[in-house]
């Protein structure tokens, strides 16, 4: 059973302490202010949402999420393979079973925050991931283009090409219409705190020294928000991909596609 939950951050002082800004070069911010708490560090959010699930240390992540803010209130849509705890000191949780009735040819409006990367091999044949928008920018600059419009257009086209590639759409079981909105391109550079690293060591100890994937103190990734329309070609592929997540990065608010039906006369 899968669950789609709306998780709202409580306006409490403890919640503010949990989500203090921890991006590199943070701007000063008072924890005692009356402003709605801001979740400035996706790593902290990701760790906090883990607390909604009763799982032993070292377990696979059972959820995807996407952060929104409306009227000064921060909330998350969380898609999970386990039912979240409804009683949490930092969150108000509304959970319901996720069992959509998709059909071939169905048209859906979608929103997705993704990590658009491609794998390239170096001279030694070693493959590594690269941000497709940054690759497009560097390519334009290497060709002598320095005007913002041309570079922005090349980056936009790269973002569209990434999500509408035939191989990707076939893998996801959809056709994505190329008339897309792209926004909020962000390069994230996050630091794990000393406390986070100590917790990782404690988790490894609790697993009787069973190896846990090593995690660097610095986390770097990019994200891009997509909004548009798609048509389902393979129900099982699409449904399974929704549960797994879209794109390489499926943590830190990436990978969750939110959809709603489109009327037949909508584009």
What are these regions (language model features)?
Residues 1-267:
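RNA-interacting cores
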């Amino acid at each position: 059973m899968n669950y789609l939950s709306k998780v709202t951050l409580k306006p409490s002082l403890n919640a503010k302490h949990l989500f203090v800004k921890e991006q590199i070069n943070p701007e000063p911010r008072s924890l005692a202010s009356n402003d709605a708490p801001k979740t400035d560090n996706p790593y902290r959010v990701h760790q906090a949402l883990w607390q909604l699930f009763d799982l032993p240390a070292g377990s696979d992540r059972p959820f995807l999420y996407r952060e929104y803010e409306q009227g000064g209130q921060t909330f998350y849509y969380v898609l999970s393979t386990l039912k979240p705890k409804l009683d949490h000191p930092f969150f108000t949780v509304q959970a319901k079973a996720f069992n959509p009735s998709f059909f071939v040819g169905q048209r859906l409006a979608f929103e997705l925050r993704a990590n658009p990367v491609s794998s390239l091999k170096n001279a030694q044949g070693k493959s590594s991931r690269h941000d497709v928008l940054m690759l497009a920018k560097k390519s334009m600059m290497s060709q002598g283009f320095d005007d913002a419009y041309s570079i922005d257009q090349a980056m936009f086209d790269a973002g569209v090409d990434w999500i509408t590639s035939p191989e990707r759409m076939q893998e996801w079981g959809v056709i994505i219409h190329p008339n897309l909105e792209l926004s909020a391109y962000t390069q994230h550079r996050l630091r794990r705190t000393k406390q986070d690293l100590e917790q990782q060591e404690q988790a490894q100890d609790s697993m009787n020294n069973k190896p846990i994937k090593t995690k660097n103190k610095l986390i770097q990734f990019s994200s891009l928000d997509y909004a548009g329309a798609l048509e389902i070609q393979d129900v099982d592929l699409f449904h399974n991909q929704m549960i797994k997540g879209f794109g390489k990065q499926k943590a830190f608010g990436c990978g969750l596609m939110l959809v709603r039906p489109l009327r037949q006369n909508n584009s």
